[in-house]
Amino acid sequence: MIFVLGIDAATWRVIRPNMGRLATFRRLCKIGRCRELVLKEKPISPSVWCGMFSGKTPEEHGHESFAVGGSLVKRQDMKVEFIWDILDREGKKVRVLNVPFIVPPYSFRVDFRPVGFGLPTNEKEWHEELERVTEKTRELLTESPDLLISTYTLLDRIQHFHWGEDYVLEWYRRVDDKIGQLLFDTGFLEEKQNKLIIISDHGFCSFGEAKVQTLPLKSEWGELKGDHHENALLIVANLDYEIERPQDIFFALKNLK
């Protein structure tokens, strides 16, 4: 089984200085390979997630925004095949949960309604997403699919509006705990044939440091404190394929038997 766990906006800038308080990340870095994945493309979420699971560059897939001409982009508007389409056609058992290359985030062969239409913007919704995505992912793990892809989105919004605050670490600790439940409490990583990829679509930094502004400085949710950085997170375990760019996730999954 291959499990790809996406953590939108996860960054080593928060994790590395706080390894003593993030037991799951600390444990993963002892048993797997942990490093930064430096994006050569713009750290724009819909584009990066799309390329990650289609194998296409931004120039090839042309998907840069959640909305075009005032309308939300839908899966059927996109002229690419994703890894789950290919593997499903080949007869593989594939489950995909909450991947945010569109709004609301996309699921495949899974019945799931994203929290807050996929844009959780307050503490209640962040708690709800964390609980519901964890619960559903754990349920899907018991089905033993050939490929499971699942994504948490909450850290992106939290960091946009709370970057530099202790509040951000509080949420990393909550996410760290849930990842531990998925990977260690279930025994997933005890099975050596199981392969794991944990990846973010970008890192994070202060608003002034960001090379790309992804949200207005002021919004109904508050003033932006942080924004996307090109240094994404990557953790792999039991995987030999070298990942140097987001698109390599597609090829790693396509080449694994």
Predicted regions and their residues:
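Feature captures the catalytic ectodomains and active-site-proximal regions of enzymes
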Residues: 1-257
